[in-house]
Amino acid sequence: MVIVAGIDVSKATLDVSVSEGPVINFENSITGIRRLLKHMERESVTKAVCESTGGYERLVVSKLREATINVQVAHPTRVRAFARACGIEAKTDPLDAQVLSRYGLIFSDSNTARPESEPEREELRQLLSRRRQLMADRVRELNRLDKGLSTSTEKSTRRHLRWLDTEIERVDEEYKKLLKHSASLSDTAELYQTVPGVWPLTAATLIAYLPELGRWDGRVLTSLVGLAPWSRDSGKKRGNRSIRGGRGTVRRALYICAWVVLRIDGDLRDFYQRLRERGKPGKVAVIAVARKLLLQLNAVARRGTPWMKQHRNNCLPYQADPA
């Protein structure tokens, strides 16, 4: 029998409901989580569900997994849609905990939960997140230079830009060092980079944000990343197919790679040209190339062998007959 604890996570507290029962409040701290574990042991909890909150859930998720409790980190949008489907429009922390408990009982982990994060993978994820923050700050400062700043303000902006450039280089060195000194991550990064157009930063992004690569079916992965075109049909109406949702960090990385690969991979360039000749807009064709790249990477990760010439239909590495 599955007994599910729904955990609504905030910065300071954890609201917990077991099997949609009464909600108990714990501190979101080491001490509070110890109390939570004792409570879950008394209630014979076999599974815990919480939402992704941008980082506040990391401590409780890691401690629960250390205690060998199955943890599902659910997408907040899906949980909210589930609550509305159940007729629950109100939103409070205790109510969210009860909704999460019901959600975890109905939905399995197969397509909604990320695999357990290794410490090195989590560190890599945080380094890449910091890099994106610094890059966003750099873009903002560059945009300010076009606003007719006073001399002193312009000097301050340029000083900040120099600091940002130095800090970005430092973070780049850190994540590359992490990849180099981790046997498993290093091998995986080298394997991904055998696919044309995949560079070190892209490989690191895939390792950090798409641990399912090589474990799941290609169709499920394209949907997970947000590269699968969704239908919008009703009756006689046939709406436009469009992508939405998914892991934006991975999707953006593959989109950039797709532009690069069009210059160096003849097969994918021909594929792009065929789509353009059929009247597909340029960005739609590039997204299709990014989807192909993801399938190629999934084949490489699944087989654990470097990328070679591929069969078009199944994206499996072609192995020549031995001489």
Where are these regions (language model features)?
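Phosphate- and other anionic-substrate recognition elements at nucleic-acid/protein interfaces
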Residues: 1-158, 162-165, 263, 284
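Phosphate-backbone recognition surface of nucleic-acid-processing proteins
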Residues: 26, 200, 205-278, 282, ...
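Amphipathic alpha-helical interaction segments
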Residues: 99, 156-159, 163, 205, ...
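A residue-level signal for conserved active-site and pocket-lining positions in enzyme catalytic cores
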Residues: 100, 134, 254, 279, ...
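Non-catalytic alpha-helical coupling and interface elements of nucleotide-dependent molecular machines
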Residues: 102-109, 139, 226-230, 259, ...
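Short alpha-helical scaffolding segments that buttress acidic/His motifs in well-ordered protein cores
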Residues: 103, 124-125, 206, 253-258, ...
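Helix-hairpin-helix/helix-loop-helix acidic hairpins
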Residues: 142, 147-201, 210, 262-265
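Charged substrate- and nucleic-acid-binding regions of tRNA-handling and nucleotidyl-transfer enzymes
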Residues: 277-311
